């Protein structure tokens, strides 16, 4: 392990000569709770002026186009970045393609765990949301039942799912979310717990190296060492 001190970087201006492209997290870097973080517009404008492409990478269960619309509503214009990639976008295309062996016997009926709005982008793929876990072929997780949840609350639910050997798809790997200044468990924590007790879970998103490969392909850089990741 290296004992070298981590250098302090005071601003984007000190990075533009070192890196050719940037993969940037959204929550906590670009915005928090639908408000842009301080200095974001100036930083993105500087990268744009210097010809440094930016791809935003998020574990949101929403599709990339929906996140791009949210960014524009907050004042981040599409010209300032090259693209957006979300965990939800990757899951959407995995479900649509059905190439991964995980999907070979998935079935068409899912029990959705999370806010209803997060399921809407996937409804067009022909899967049916069922209200009862006994009818489901698999579990689709985008969130929790509520912000005051704890993992203990889900133990009976997990036991039923495991007894039926239901596979789980997690479209938001983040274990926690920050709301009103407090941390709450999120979809990723539920998926990790289900996997821990023996459940079969499929997920994509940070910090899985494959999602960075998608971003690098989109950036089309000749030297990957000159791509900076900002955020978690």
Regions from the language model: what does each represent?
Residues 1-232:
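HAD-like aspartate-dependent phosphatase fold
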């Amino acid at each position: 392990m290296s004992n070298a001190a981590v250098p302090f970087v005071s601003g984007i201006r000190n990075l533009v000569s070192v890196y050719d492209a940037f993969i940037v997290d959204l929550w906590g870097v670009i915005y928090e709770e639908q408000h842009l973080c301080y200095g974001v517009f100036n930083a993105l404008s500087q990268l744009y002026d210097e010809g440094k492409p930016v791809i935003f990478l998020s574990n949101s269960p929403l599709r990339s186009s929906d996140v791009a619309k949210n960014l524009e509503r907050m004042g981040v214009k599409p010209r300032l970045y090259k693209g957006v990639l979300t965990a939800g976008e990757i899951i959407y295309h995995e479900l649509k393609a059905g190439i991964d062996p995980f999907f070979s016997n998935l079935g068409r009926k899912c029990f959705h765990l999370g806010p209803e709005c997060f399921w809407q982008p996937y409804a067009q793929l022909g899967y049916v949301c069922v209200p009862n876990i006994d009818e489901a072929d698999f579990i689709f997780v985008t969130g929790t039942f509520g912000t005051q949840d704890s993992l203990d609350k889900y133990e009976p639910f997990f036991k039923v799912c495991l007894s039926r050997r239901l596979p789980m798809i997690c479209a938001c790997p983040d274990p926690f979310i920050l709301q009103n200044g407090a941390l709450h468990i999120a979809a990723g924590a539920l998926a990790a717990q289900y996997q821990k007790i023996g459940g079969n879970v499929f997920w994509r998103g940070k910090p899985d190296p494959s999602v960075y490969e998608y971003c690098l392909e989109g950036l089309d850089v000749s030297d990957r060492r000159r791509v900076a990741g900002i955020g978690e």
